[in-house]
Amino acid sequence: MSASTTATLRHDWTLAEVRALFVQPFNDLLFQAQTVHRAHFDANRVQVSTLLSIKTGACPEDCKYCPQSGHYNTGLEKEKLLEVQKVLEEAARAKAIGSTRFCMGAAWKHPSAKDMPYVLEMVKGVKAMGMETCMTLGRLDQEQTEALATAGLDYYNHNLDTSPEFYGSIITTRTYSERLQTLAYVRDAGMKICSGGILGMGESLDDRAGLLIQLANLPEHPESVPINMLVKVAGTPLENAEDVDPFDFIRMLAVARILMPKSHVRLSAGREAMNEQMQALAFFAGANSIFYGDKLLTTANPQADKDMLLFSRLGIKPEAGEGHADEVHQAAIEQALVEQQSSSMFYDAASA
């Protein structure tokens, strides 16, 4: 067994080391990743989250992959910030069918002073339901970060998207250093970090390695690392980007698992395009978190009942959330997920 499979937490990965992980034989890489995974997680448990878009469209950022950018005509109807009560109703529905974490996303460059009180009420309300809370609101200043932490926010999502070298080819309205600063504020405020990136934007292997190096070499590893496959949306500059080789995507998940042994690696956007065999490989490679429901912000996500049927076929069960380890409660969640047949409970932020 190589030194890398011992799952020692490191923050000094080099490009040469990570490149070597990527290019080794596929079976060797997956064996190594699965070995690391089993050292820290139950290999047959997957964390389940629900994501709600609380403010959709008209974002001033120019991210070339994003249908919510106001710079591109994608046909997405913009919406104002959802009312707090509506958000809490959706959180209650998500909890009722088994989600343990509720993530709220807003298409902002950064939250405004007038919106922050409503955002904080959302956090407090969802937290009061006994769910883990997560938000993605764009860039934060230190005061906003501390306010979110005080309100009870558990996780803050702020993706790095790609390597520092390729970043300028995708986004010009926010710097890489600004993203890193937001992550530093989040960590200093005592919240957990959710940060990852996207494959399929024209990046090189070294860019993929570079993204993971940035994340793994942070002072503390992100607790959650979402790995997204580009969802090509008409009207965005990347609508005709070349498809990602499925094996290359699985390699990305496996290397993320090896570099960040204790982090949840999330199989995130793009799952709609993955067949069941590819998703099963993703779980074997160390992915142990998914978004559950019909929409991932504004792009399609596999239907909830299909997810649970696949879980059943693979012998996978949903992971209990923090503070939700009671066996009776967990059994009820698992049964509700298996029996769930309708996805009508989930709010489609793009169709309101």
UniProtKB/Swiss-Prot annotation:
Pathway: Cofactor biosynthesis; biotin biosynthesis; biotin from 7,8-diaminononanoate: step 2/2. Its EC number is 2.8.1.6. The keyword Membrane does not apply. [4Fe-4S] cluster binds at residues 59, 63, 66. It catalyses: (4R,5S)-dethiobiotin + (sulfur carrier)-SH + 2 reduced [2Fe-2S]-[ferredoxin] + 2 S-adenosyl-L-methionine = (sulfur carrier)-H + biotin + 2 5'-deoxyadenosine + 2 L-methionine + 2 oxidized [2Fe-2S]-[ferredoxin]. PANTHER family: BIOTIN SYNTHASE, BIOTIN SYNTHASE, MITOCHONDRIAL. This is Biotin synthase. It comes from Pseudomonas syringae pv. syringae (strain B728a).
